[in-house]
């Protein structure tokens, strides 16, 4: 800061300072500090003489290089120590694995558990290795000799949870195990009501005891109907019991025929018997040697069954019909004998699953002898019947729409809906076929026809 003072300024305006030739006035109380002088006798030494006499020895640089060399040596020593530790651990691991192998083979004492290698959890229960899945092994096939009575108190079967940790699927043979278990099948049969198995009306003459002389031929014939999938004939279950005397011994176990009546229709009586339960005749010998399951006559099989087909009145509302006497006609021997061996095997396979001979034969007439197609047709037929539709109408719709469940269900629902409105069944069917199940167009056509008539 340049400060210039002039006498005139001091006299007139007081002390004035200048900054870059710009005057400004300071406060009157401001006083400039006094000058500081050097102490007496103070003098600066000659630096050039001092520097010329100084000799630099490079001690700092030498110390720095020494520190770097020591650090490199320390790092190399640490690397050698780590390599030695890794080598020792690998050698110990190899020795431990060899000791474990020798201990398992030669019977040496095993090492403590903390020194052993960790075994995967799934292999711990089966270290010894099981040869087979013993818990789900199928039972042996029924023998052709004299059957021995089953013990009243069978030995309990214990569940081995280790079998479920193996790689193979424990449920592969579950179906065979279930179907071959005679005790379970006997429990199922004995738990069913007697009215669902035996017909309510049978002539007294048909309840003839089976003589011992006729038993061996029937036992010899069971091999003909032995199924590779493990189905068990009722002959091997309980020959001397009440059910054994009323059920055909050569007929495979029909689980579906032992179910309770359908509960889908609230108007059905609880005493009604499902149509899948066919009246059976006691086992008897035939002169031509044909198994009784292939030759069944309908002369003595008349029984009283309710008619399940709904009958529509003039106003279209369904009414409950009274039970009528119908005659069940199992397929004659000539019908099955006229089939080819492949067709007969297809029939026996599907019948063994619980379906009736009549239903299987009808399905085969429409679908051929492909088991998958026949089963698909039967499944569709069963689902539609479970919805409460008439079996005959279901078969007609499936044949009309080539097995399409969606179109058949739509047709049956519209038939039922228009029938409740009071239209004629034949007219409804004709209109639905013309308009391809179009509800609005079909209803308009029905109203037009009703108005015209």
From Swiss-Prot:
The keyword Kinase does not apply. Its main location: cytoplasm. Residues 83-119, 189-223, 260-335 are annotated as: Disordered. One of its GO terms (molecular function) is ubiquitin binding. Disruption phenotype: Impaired motor neuron outgrowth, leading to decreased mobility and shorter lifespan. Axon lengths is significantly shorter in motor neurons. CDD domains: UBA1_UBAP1, UBA2_UBAP1_like. Residues 19-65 form the UMA domain. Residues 340-381, 403-449 form the UBA domain. SUPFAM superfamilies: UBA-like (SSF46934). It is found in: Cytoplasm, Cytosol; Endosome. Keywords: Cytoplasm, Endosome, Protein transport, Repeat, Transport. Component of the ESCRT-I complex, a regulator of vesicular trafficking process. Binds to ubiquitinated cargo proteins and is required for the sorting of endocytic ubiquitinated cargos into multivesicular bodies (MVBs). The UMA domain mediates association with the ESCRT-I complex. Component of an ESCRT-I complex (endosomal sorting complex required for transport I). This is Ubiquitin-associated protein 1. It comes from Danio rerio (Zebrafish). The lineage of its organism: Eukaryota, Metazoa, Chordata, Craniata, Vertebrata. The gene is ubap1.
